[in-house]
C-alpha cells in the first residue's frame, strides 16, 4: 500500500527548519559576544544619562534635536576612538564632518530630554573600526552595511562598514532605550523572544 504523506506535516517540518536556521545567527552572536556581558554608559565624557544642561556644561551647543561641538570645547577636543582623534573637517565645501561629534536628543514634546545617540567620525576605514570592535567585543549583528554590538544594559555600538572602503569611519553609540528600536528593526520581535540565547527581556 502506498504511503500517504500529509502536506501539513511537511509544512510544519519546513517551518521548524526555517526557524532553526533563522535563530542560528542570533544564538551564535549572543554566545560569542563579549559586549553582551558588559554595560555601555556612553562615549567617554558624554554619558547617556547626562541632562541637557550637563551637555551644555561640557561645551556643546544644543539646538532642537542635536548638540554639537561647534566651539571646539577643550574638554571634548582631544577625545579619541580606537587611538584616533575625532575627525573634524575644516573644508568649507564639506561641512558634513565639521562638528566632529553630534549628540542626538529625544523630542522636545517628550520631557525630560535625553540622549538617543552619539555620532562621530575617525580617520579610519569602516572595515578597520569593525575589525577592532570585533576583537574587543566579539561577533556582531550585520544589517544593511552596518555592524552592531549590543551590550548588557541594552546600549549598542554601530559602525558603517559597506563593501567599498568608507572613510572617515562613521560610528554611532545608541542609548539603551533607543537601541531597543534598532534591535527590533534588525530582528523581528517574535524571533528574539523565541531565542533562549538573547531575549528582549535582557534589554
Predicted regions and their residues:
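Bacterial N-terminal signal peptides that target proteins for export
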Residues: 3-16
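Serine/threonine-rich, low-complexity intrinsically disordered segments
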Residues: 6-7, 19-20, 173, 198
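Short linear motifs in intrinsically disordered/low-complexity regions
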Residues: 9-11, 50, 90-91, 95-96, ...
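Residues at beta-strand starts and edge strands
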Residues: 13-15, 99, 114-116
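Bacterial N-terminal signal peptides
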Residues: 15-25
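Sec/Tat signal peptide C-region and signal peptidase I cleavage site
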Residues: 26-30
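Non-cytosolic coordination micro-motifs
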Residues: 31-82, 111-203
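Compositionally biased P/S/T/G-rich terminal and signal peptide-adjacent segments
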Residues: 76-109
